[in-house]
Amino acid sequence: MSDTLVRIKRAILSGHYAFSEKASLELESDGLTELDIVESIVNAVAIYKTIRSQSPYRKQVREYLHIIQSTNLEGLMVYSKGKLVQEAGIETYYFLISSKKAV
């Protein structure tokens, strides 16, 4: 398991995560809960893909988005995309940009 995935899981398990408005809308439209996303990330054995952010709103020159596809505890495949963020001395938190059922 990668160091990045371990850091993401620790942030999630510590409650250090947030959802963008887009991710919240996707959750609602797919009938998912925040717990479904948390379970999916905790169950993940690998990061599916890491990409560089193309957003003009990014705060750093290099910002990476981590895509995780894994099942929740009921076996439902969930797709999430997010980034690790360092703020105010808190180790990290994971900001979810996209969260929905995997196709």
Where are these regions (language model features)?
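Ribonuclease/tRNase effector modules and their secretory precursors
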Residues: M1-V103
